[in-house]
Amino acid sequence: MLVLDNVTKAFKTGTFGGGTLPAVRGASFEIRPGEVTALIGESGSGKSTLGKMILRLTPVTSGTITFEGTDIATLKGKQLREYYRHVQGVFQDPFSSYNPVYRADRVFATIKHSYFPSVSAAEWRDRVDGSLESVGLNPVDVRNKFTHQLSGGQLQRILIARALLLDIKILVADEIISMIDASTRVDVLNLLSNLKARGLGVLFVTHDLSLGNYISERTIILRRGVVVEMGATQKVFDNPQHEYTRMLLTAVPQLHKKWEGELGAEVEAIGATSQDQDRGRPGRYSKSSLHPLVGMRGRKGRRAQAVATEREFAAGLLRTDTYLRTHEEVPPLVEIEEDHFVATSTGAG
């Protein structure tokens, strides 16, 4: 298990480094075997910085990250190499992980050189082929190809196949499906689900709440580098307590809901009423189930409600941001129910 305890990262700013910019403040959570943990937040909220600290690509300013009881900041030489045998990362832009001068499958050669120097070439080839097949790739299709000859989805899966050649226990997946097409996204998500079933712990970094809800057992919500809500995914999504979480969830498009025209337009839905949906029966959605504004009478009423809702969220967000700007200490997380924590002092309901 990988544990973050009060982890903070502050970058130096200014011409002579006289200022500091806190990217992550007091983050504490676990990545457990056989679970997907979704790390959700807007761009600039500190998600990727947390991933890079876990992978030792950027140092921790304060706090500790421990893997199987050992502080990873103390690892050097062979110990650090052994850490990377168990903890790997795949990033948003797969092309950045390859040298375009070489063929894409050269990433496997570096693994062999570092971890399996005594394995014969024939045996290593069999291992690589098996790993590629396990992520849905035909070795013949990708072997000896340069990066520009492969798709983003293929390159992502090659990186995952490389990780699987090691005794991997933790995978940091940083926005890994944001640059690939919809059908390939499904393949990668199914692959992550299979890895989870094999006991792998995954940190799924994303700004997409729908994907986080779809794939994860646990969810962490970040705002300005601070964990404002976290816990079991179903509890965070079904019973959001922090204003920021509520605002994010309200903005998430629903696949079974359709918006047509202005707020005043009549909207008809395909599917089932909420009652029929709960019973698993086909039917229709009522207008009020489509959108919180659609069931109201009159355009003025809907617009007034829209303005009121926006003001409510803006006020809550202002409370959160004001607290984070004016307080050096990290707002405490309070357990409001089993495995559901919220930073109450920054705008929780």
Where are these regions (language model features)?
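A short, surface-exposed alpha-helical micro-motif characterized by mixed small hydrophobic
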Residues: 212-214
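ABC ATPase "signature
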Residues: 227-231
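Short catalytic/signature loops enriched in Gly
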Residues: 233-349
